[in-house]
From Swiss-Prot:
One BP annotation, GO: arginyl-tRNA aminoacylation
CC per GO annotation: cytoplasm
PANTHER family, per database record: ARGININE--TRNA LIGASE, CYTOPLASMIC (PTHR11956:SF5), ARGINYL-TRNA SYNTHETASE (PTHR11956)
MF terms (GO), sorted A to Z: arginine-tRNA ligase activity; ATP binding
Xref: InterPro entries: aa-tRNA-synth_I_CS, Arg-tRNA-ligase, Arg-tRNA-synth_N, Arg-tRNA-synth_N_sf, ArgRS_core, DALR_anticod-bd, Rossmann-like_a/b/a_fold, tRNAsynth_Ia_anticodon-bd
Pfam families cross-referenced by the UniProt entry: Arg_tRNA_synt_N (PF03485), DALR_1 (PF05746), tRNA-synt_1d (PF00750)
Catalyses which reaction(s): tRNA(Arg) + L-arginine + ATP = L-arginyl-tRNA(Arg) + AMP + diphosphate
Name the UniProt record assigns to this protein: Arginine--tRNA ligase
UniProt record similarity statement: Belongs to the class-I aminoacyl-tRNA synthetase family.
Motif 'HIGH' region, residue range(s) on this chain: 129-139
Main location: cytoplasm
SMART domains: Arg_tRNA_synt_N, DALR_1
Length: 561
């Protein structure tokens, strides 16, 4: 609909320039927006205000001239009017809106998708948890957001690669190995042999038991058989990382989250990538020695202070392998990369980008892009839940999936903007009532399926486009649904472009609400066969769109509840 109006306006401007009623010859970018108030029309544009300066006329005068040249050959407009300082408002005919239903029916389960990405490559890195324990609820929110962003990008024509980066080197992994070793020797957190920064969750006992039993674990590209020797700390490290990678993979599979590529920090050290990046940075002239440490002059690239690359003791700080990893992404041909991470990674953005800029590799200053999500608070009975028996110090993703189910967990994780803190109310997520947002949406789909069953029992068939008279749909509740369906592709494009999955969750609640409101006020099966057919056709389009939108969130559309 918006494209049709843009064409109408462009043709009107061409007519104005052709007869001299306007003289600038400019064709500005035509923005078509939905007005805040319904009485201002279905769509509005400020194009006259954009042209006023070039035309040396008041915006309303430009608007009046343009409107007089708008030839609505397709007959979609009921009324075109000028409002305020020069807005042009378009009121569309109901008949034009109802054509949306034919489009939904024709496109079916592809409705809402587009090709705006043009098949271009984009890599999305998300979750990227350290393999030191079960995934926590922060990882869960990142998994839901990252996976939904990937689904949205794929739906809008991008060639998406999903990637998980394991920080399997460094002090945290060393602490993991020491913790497992202590358990192998029968020591616990209260014993003298326990490491000062050891991991205390029950899962460490499971790792130690499996290691001593010489089990073999399979995690993506790794197959590791335990040595069973409690003295071999390196063997313990390798096995513990593989064991916990497998556990994380299983949790993500239960969450219906999958990856195309797994990358390991340890590989960057093993194949020399980290050392090569350090040499390139030194050769670039952006480093200096101070206090027996190697520094990168990141203040030359918008950082608030210079950063240590190599500590005085000889080890590299964590952002050095991060720079090496992102350089590898660039060299793999990903000119567009999105990192979905927790907000606690905010400080790393500037230094990673600075390191990449210092390489003089032609990487744009704003590369990569970031989506940062805020923390999650879990409530049960109005009280915050802080610990899990298995993890020891935090609530795990598996805890939530097991208690409230995958669908509710995914919906709750994405129903707020990523940069908003999220309160996950377990009691609400488990409710089978319309107060529960995911139940509210899924029940709308199941309710429509039930209506179809009831219609079939009474001899009615859900019609195709050829067997329906859409002019029967005249009630305000019906037209509100039709208009909401028409905006779905735009919602998908906006959600993908801005990495904001919550827009889909909001849309689902809005559409479900419109359906419930319609159903509570109107009968679907009536004595008028044409009206019944039209309403069944309308509900078929609603069910299709609900299912398409739920699929973008990785959530099922049940037919019975």
């Amino acid at each position: 609909m918006k494209e049709l109006l843009r064409t109408l306006i462009s043709q009107g401007l061409a007519g104005c320039y052709a007869d001299g009623s306007l003289s600038s010859g400019e064709f500005p970018s035509i923005i078509i927006e939905k007005p805040a108030h319904a009485d201002h029309g279905d769509f509005a544009t400020n194009v006259a205000m954009l042209l006023a300066k070039a035309e040396k006329k008041a915006p309303r005068m430009v608007a009046e001239t343009l409107v007089s040249h708008l030839a609505d050959g397709s007959g979609v407009c009921e009324k075109i009017e000028i409002a305020g300082p020069g807005f042009i408002n378009f009121h569309l005919k109901d008949e034009a809106w109802r054509q949306t239903l034919l489009e939904v029916d024709q496109i079916g389960f592809e409705y809402g998708k587009s090709g705006v990405g043009g098949g271009k490559k984009i890599q999305v890195e998300f979750v990227s948890a350290n393999p030191t324990g079960p995934l926590h609820i922060g990882h869960g929110r990142g998994a839901a957001l990252g996976d939904t962003i990937c689904r949205l990008l794929s739906a809008t024509g991008w060639d998406v690669t999903r990637e998980f980066y394991y920080n399997d080197a460094g002090q945290q992994i060393a602490n993991l190995a020491l913790s497992v070793q202590a358990r192998c020797f029968g020591n616990g957190p209260d014993d003298p042999g326990w490491p000062s920064d050891g991991y205390q969750g029950e899962y460490i006992i499971d790792v130690a038991r499996a290691y001593m039993a010489r089990e073999t674990v399979h995690a993506d590209d790794q197959h590791v058989t335990a040595a069973g020797d409690p003295q071999d700390l390196e063997a313990i490290r390798r096995f513990a990382v593989a064991f916990l990678r497998r556990e994380q993979d299983q949790d993500l599979a239960a969450f219906d989250v999958h990856f195309d590529v797994y990358s390991l920090e340890s590989d960057l050290y093993a194949d020399g990538s980290v050392e090569r990046v350090v040499r390139r940075l030194v050769d670039s002239g952006h480093t200096y020695e101070q206090d027996d440490a190697l520094w990168l002059r990141t203040t030359s690239f918008a950082d608030d202070k210079d950063r240590v690359m190599r500590k005085s003791g000889g080890g590299y700080t964590y952002f050095v392998p991060d720079v090496a990893y992102h350089l590898r992404k660039w060299e793999r041909g990903f000119t567009r990369v999105v990192n979905e991470q927790g907000a606690d990674h905010h400080s790393t953005i500037t230094r990673v980008r600075a390191g990449l800029q210092a390489l003089d590799a032609g990487i744009p200053a704003g590369w990569p892009e970031y989506v940062l999500h805020q923390m999650v608070t879990v409530l049960r009975g109005g009280e915050e839940v802080k610990i899990s028996k298995r993890a020891g110090s935090y609530v795990t993703l598996r805890d939530l999936i097991d208690e409230v189910g995958r669908d509710a967990t995914r919906f709750f994780f994405v129903m707020r903007k990523p940069d908003s803190q999220l309160v996950f109310d377990i009691d609400l997520a488990k409710q089978k009532s319309l107060d529960n947002p995911v139940y509210y949406v899924q029940y709308a789909h199941a309710r429509i399926c039930s209506i179809f069953e009831n219609a079939a029992e009474k001899g009615f068939v859900v019609p195709g486009a050829d067997g329906v008279n859409l002019d029967q749909l005249i009630e305000p509740e019906e037209m509100a649904i039709v208009k909401a369906l028409a905006f779905f592709p735009e919602v998908v494009e906006g959600s993908a472009a801005n990495f904001e999955p919550h827009r889909i969750a909001n849309y689902l609640q809005e559409l479900a609400g419109l359906f419930h409101g319609f159903y509570n006020k109107n009968r679907v099966i009536t004595e008028d066969s044409q009206l019944t057919a039209a309403r069944l056709f309308l509900l078929k389009c609603v069910a299709l769109t609900l299912k398409n939108a739920l699929n973008l969130l990785g959530i099922s559309a049940p037919e019975k509840m």
